[in-house]
Regions:
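Short beta-strand edge/turn micro-motifs at domain boundaries
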Residues: 99, 115-145
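Surface-exposed, charged secondary-structure patches
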Residues: 76-112
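Flexible, active-site-adjacent loop/turn segments at secondary-structure boundaries
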Residues: 23, 89, 117
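Core segments of small alpha/beta cavity-forming domains
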Residues: 7-79, 83
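Intrinsically disordered, low-complexity boundary segments flanking structured domains
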Residues: 68-76, 88-91, 124-128
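Long amphipathic alpha-helical segments used for membrane anchoring, targeting, substrate engagement
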Residues: 1-7
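Aromatic-residue hotspot detector
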Residues: 30, 38, 104-105, 119
Length: 145
């Protein structure tokens, strides 16, 4: 998923880019769930729990994460999310799907004695609008820093 929205672009007329978020979109519950999903996915990634990761990702993203987990082998991983903030950047909809871009910033610490490290990344999540029970699924991660 290489398509990423322009976060701070401006037009030739000099007007600032305004993200497209539908007026009826429930931003606060979405952000609350996005933060929870970030933390749960981090824990599932640390433990290599592909079943739990599958619940939060598209099949393509699951394949990428699975390959990363296999690459690290038996090396244990413990990441503490020390602080997280999230901002909804954009929501694009078609007749049958929606894609939302969420910018996560905060601090992570590897292990129990690692130094806190800042992170800044954009997650692209998608939802099947034809299925009333569909969840938002992680489709891509864009590192910004």
């Amino acid at each position: 998923f290489n398509t990423s929205p322009e976060v701070a672009a401006s037009s030739s007329a000099g007007t600032a880019y305004r993200p497209s978020i539908p007026a009826d979109f429930q931003v606060e519950p979405f952000i609350r769930n996005a933060k929870s999903s970030f933390i749960r996915l981090q824990a599932a990634n640390d433990s290599g729990d592909l079943d739990q990761i599958r619940d939060f990702t598209t099949p393509e993203m699951l394949d990428e994460i699975s390959a990363e987990i296999k690459q690290r082998g038996n090396a244990s991983q413990k990441t503490e999310v020390m602080f997280i903030d999230a901002h909804l950047l954009e929501v694009e909809t078609t007749s049958d799907s929606a894609i939302a871009s969420v910018r996560f910033t905060g601090q992570l610490r590897d292990g129990t004695d690692g130094e806190p490290e800042s992170f800044d990344e954009i997650w692209h999540v998608q939802k099947d609008l034809k299925d009333p029970n569909a969840s938002w699924l992680l489709a891509g991660i864009q590192q910004t820093a």
